[in-house]
Amino acid sequence: MAMTTYGDITPRTAAYVAVELLKRAMPYLCLEKFGQAKSLPGNKTQSMKFRRYNSLGLRTTPLTEGVTPSSEKLTATDITATLYQYGGLVEITDIIVDTHEDPVLQEATAVSSEQAAKTVETLRYNVLKACTNVFYANSVASRGLVAAAISRADQRKIVRALERQEAQHLTSIVKSTPSFNTESILPAYVGITHVDLTSDIRSMDGFTSVADYGKQQAWETEIGACEDVRYLKSTIFTPYEDEGAATSTMLTTSGSKADVYPVMYFGKDAYGLIALKGKYAITPIVINPVPSKSDPLGQRGSVSWKTMQTTIILNDAWMAVYECAATD
């Protein structure tokens, strides 16, 4: 049997499977929304260029009557990121296909989409939590001294630092759909962290629950807002286990030192990424358990996926990582 890029399925079926993969992946992709997102082009390039235009200087000299002022040129900073390929494979036997009461292809697609989304989101998290603009709860000097929960006072320090660096509020995000589109939002910074901090965030002075947003639409996994910041949560953004100070009141893995949770704050264009969206975002491959030279009895098949991905910090000053503990 002739094999295509997609295994034993046609390009049309592959396109359908890809859309299903992306639909199921969307709920896990918090970071997808807020970066400078680019869709993967059809030529499968191994690098992607992100561009940031530089600010113009001030013009404080009065104009002279009848004299055209000198012109300026736009300047930009280009940052090139290398793309890497990732993928996963689920093996299916002929017995499972013949005897399983559930639709095996659909189930394999479901678990593969979850695997793809969590893989991509974890890769992004590992890059972004390494931001050099770091704050510690209660203004301690290092991670090993962290033993306090998130607070509005600390948030205000972070927002002030972002504003001093002219980090702009987010005014648009990438839509939570398989296609590559954006939508406008009310200006805000965003804070993204682990689900363990949900109660502490809700306990912050001035917190507004998503239930009280009124006409403003809440995002998937959004907790609510506190002043300039809207907060989202995910199980993917795991803490540094036992790396905080000794504690008896904060969450801890070992029972002695606090787990330290990164909260990532973002302004506009703080980071760039390849969106898990669009025609070339992900490639599904389905191999049916049919006889072949390598499998004469047709006992083995598979459902797999692969994607080209990258994430890069574009400006450390336009984002921040705040490390805190979680109340037990």
Where are these regions (language model features)?
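Short, charged/polar micro-motifs that form catalytic or ligand-binding hotspots
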Residues: 40, 76, 98-106, 110, ...
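Short acidic, glycine/tyrosine-flanked loop/strand segments centered on an H-E-D-like triad
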Residues: 73-100, 279, 283-285
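Sequence/fold signature of self-assembling virion shell proteins
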Residues: 2-34, 144-176, 188-192, 196-328
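Structured, hydrophobic secondary-structure cores that serve as assembly/anchoring elements
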Residues: 84-100, 104, 177-193, 199-201, ...
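Alpha-helical scaffold segments that mediate packing/assembly in large oligomeric complexes
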Residues: 99-175
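An acidic- and aromatic-residue-enriched active-site/binding cleft used to recognize and process polar
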Residues: 53-55, 95, 128, 194-196, ...
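N-terminal "assembly arms/tails" that initiate or stabilize quaternary assembly
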Residues: 1-82, 319, 324
